[in-house]
UniProtKB/Swiss-Prot annotation:
Top-level taxon in the UniProt lineage: Viruses
Keyword Zinc-finger: no
Glycoprotein keyword on record: no
Location(s), subcellular: Virion membrane
Keywords, comma-separated and alphabetical: Host-virus interaction, Membrane, Viral attachment to host cell, Viral attachment to host entry receptor, Virion, Virus entry into host cell
Role played: Plays a role in viral entry into host cells. Forms a pentameric complex at the surface of the viral envelope together with gH, gL, UL130 and UL131. This complex is required for entry in epithelial, endothelial and myeloid host cells. Mechanistically, engages host receptor(s) including neurophilin 2/NRP2 to mediate infection.
Record GO biological process: entry receptor-mediated virion attachment to host cell; symbiont entry into host cell
Matching InterPro entries: Herpes_UL130_cytomegalovirus
Protein name: Uncharacterized protein UL130
Subunit structure: Forms the envelope pentamer complex (PC) composed of gH, gL, UL128, UL130, and UL131A. The pentamer interacts with host NRP2.
One cellular-component annotation, GO: membrane
Entry similarity comment: Belongs to the HHV-5 UL130 protein family.
Length: 214
């Protein structure tokens, strides 16, 4: 029995070696692509995004999580029975490459980030915060809804730095906290707090009372 199986396996390999193009390409004969001779895969451009997603569907495995900052755009593709009617995502990175991904936790995070990054209200927030004003900005109800859908209610960032004063130095910690909230009347509140502490929580140090600009 083992000899028969090996013989059958060798026969299949021989057929695919002789008829390589039909064996490998026949399931994807409907795929149409515009490509130069032997291009790297990242330069392959498909005439239709659906064709690209359908081609890669059977080979898709979850990719390791990636930062949303690596990507410049995305496209959502609905597939048919060949992909079990799944929704796939084409993620475009800044090097001109395209990732074809199924829905996952990190992919949803990337989509959430990209779909809100170019919204007008989210671009105005840092511009307003960097300019002296009375703190009141007029926004529309639609802007408030977009802000509420994409905002992070509370975020904390820590930065360690060293203050050096001659022969003495202190290890300091800068803590940046931001809060965002959308009220029922669609008014928006956005606050930022900056605090400085010493790494070992000493009370009076260069970190909290510096005598030089860092």
């Amino acid at each position: 029995m083992l000899r028969l199986l090996l013989r059958h396996h060798f026969h299949c390999l021989l057929l695919c070696a002789v008829w390589a193009t039909p064996c490998l390409a026949s399931p994807w004969s409907t795929l149409t692509a515009n490509q130069n001779p032997s291009p790297p895969w990242s330069k392959l451009t498909y005439s239709k995004p659906h064709d690209a997603a359908t081609f890669y569907c059977p080979f898709l495995y979850p990719s390791p999580p990636r930062s949303p900052l690596q990507f410049s755009g995305f496209q959502q593709v609905s597939t048919g029975p060949e992909c079990r009617n799944e929704t796939l995502y084409l993620l475009y990175n800044r090097e001109g490459q395209t990732l074809v991904e199924r829905s996952s936790t990190w992919v949803k995070k990337v989509i959430w980030y990209l779909s809100g990054r170019n919204q007008t209200i989210l671009q105005r927030m840092p511009q307003t915060a960097s300019k002296p004003s009375d703190g009141n900005v007029q926004i529309s109800v639609e802007d408030a809804k977009i802000f509420g859908a994409h905002m992070v209610p509370k975020q904390t960032k820590l930065l360690r730095f060293v203050v050096n004063d001659g022969t003495r130095y202190q290890m300091c910690v800068m803590k940046l906290e931001s809060w965002a909230h959308v009220f029922r009347d669609y008014s928006v509140s956005f606050q930022v707090r900056l605090t400085f502490t010493e790494a070992n929580n000493q009370t009076y140090t260069f970190c909290t009372h510096p005598n030089l600009i860092v």
